[in-house]
A protein has these predicted regions:
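Sec-dependent N-terminal signal peptides
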Residues: 4-14
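Outer membrane pore-forming secretion/assembly proteins and partners of Gram-negative envelopes
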Residues: 18-133
Length: 133
């Protein structure tokens, strides 16, 4: 009986100290050549995080799902799938871009979306780090 009780106590103490993988993302976002924001968010691995913001009367949003991955060179990396868009006054969301970035932890990664000869539609940079919750 004493061994069973000890096993149960150990099981609960291990789960009490278990932590969830998460990612701390520091971003810079520009839409149509205008700096929109520099948000920071911590997201659980595989779960969607959402940021909405308003600047100069214009609303925008960023959604992101992050997970551990490997870079092409085999190093540990963080894969981030974004949805970036604008929010109209009536609340309607318009997606501007859905970029994906694979980043080495604590190194800046950037993606710019646009067409040749035209102003950029979107520029998103991110510094991602692993953390726990």
């Amino acid at each position: 009986m004493g061994k069973l009780l000890l096993a149960v106590v150990c099981l609960f103490s291990v789960s009490a100290f278990a932590s969830e993988k998460a990612f701390d993302l520091k971003m810079d976002l520009s839409i149509e050549g205008k700096h929109v924001s520099s948000p920071r968010i911590v997201v659980k691995e595989g779960e969607k995080g959402t940021i909405t913001q308003e600047s100069n009367g214009e609303k925008s949003f960023i959604e992101v799902v992050a997970k551990e991955d490997k870079a092409p060179n085999g190093k540990q990396a963080i894969h981030m799938a974004f949805v970036v868009g604008k929010i109209a006054n009536d609340g309607t969301r318009t997606v501007v871009s859905q970029p994906q970035i694979i980043s080495i932890p604590n190194e800046k990664a950037q993606i710019t979306v646009g067409e040749n000869g035209k102003p950029e539609v979107l520029s998103l940079s991110v510094i991602a780090n692993k953390t726990t919750l």
